[in-house]
């Protein structure tokens, strides 16, 4: 017989179909991953139960912590991102919150890019301070500013591969080097890029998060998030993360770095934060995300192909003031970063400024028929929204401008429809304003 599938070095398109279920279900022979719709699991005996709870025997304990359907999804995402382990949770917001809560505690500090999703900005600027965690927001393209923002109590840098909503490309490798020089990890939100286009761990990132609701699911049918542990950050050598390295009083005095090795980071989130706060993903949503993963590469290729044609159309439209997409950026830094991180193209979520004011932008949106006006992105269907009054409305006028969001800014998420139909819909809306 040939080499077992799990022992082969498989390409991305194969990994997205097979990891976690290299063979049919051993009980039923089902080739599709079954939905294990259960709240709990039977132990063989009392000793077996104690071993599971003590983390000396790996396996299912309770549905809030693990599920076999979820496990396949986690294995597959970890493989696609090149990490050692992953944890799926109830939303992308939960993934980000758990990641940063696992790094910073009361009295500690985070450095974050100022071009991140408005919800994450709000979490860091307003919610975390209530728990004693502060954040300094920096221009991710001003590396001196990034470095100078790091304090003695800083525990992480957080960035997004592509800024939200303008899709500016961040230099992951450069910021990872700054973080590591100060013995802190870099966490990267890779939602907008997907591992098919960029794998941040290969450029020095330590933790990757996703809103699985977006490209991973791809069809707007489920809410979920995922955290991928790169497994390479040396928590013990850093000396800044005692909750990972020292005996944890919340879990029988266990040291997560000793008990879980390279997967210590996500293991602690599962064992402590998920256990205590319960942002658990449902088995059915895990199943839906697995369906999405099976076509991720195919969909992203079409998203990118369509987006680049729409960008070209908008860039030559006399009613457009400016298109914010790295493929047409006049900034030589952005041009170089786009070439480095997106050799096959990228960025199907981007913004443009229509000539006119906020009302012009809203009138344009209201005249679109093919595009759906909603808060999600990365659906196979094309989507549109006015960021200043919706997704980023919690920001002040000054904060909006810092993120490059103006009253006449419109965000598009280009779907997989025929691109001629997409452009026709845009053209009719332009004609109406």
Where are these regions (language model features)?
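PLP-dependent enzyme catalytic core of the Aspartate aminotransferase-like
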Residues: 1-3, 125, 134, 152, ...
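N-terminal "arm"/small-domain region of PLP-dependent enzymes with the aminotransferase-like
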Residues: 2-67, 75-76
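Conserved PLP-enzyme active-site core in the AAT-like
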Residues: 2-8, 20-24, 86-316
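Conserved N-terminal alpha-helix of the aminotransferase class I/II PLP-enzyme fold
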Residues: 45-97, 119-126
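Well-ordered beta-strand positions enriched in small/hydrophobic/aromatic, beta-favoring residues
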Residues: 157, 225-227, 323, 350, ...
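Short hydrophobic/aromatic beta-strand micro-patches
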Residues: 228, 351-353, 413-415
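Conserved small-domain helix->loop->beta segment predominantly found in fold-type I
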Residues: 277-280, 284-286, 295, 300-302, ...
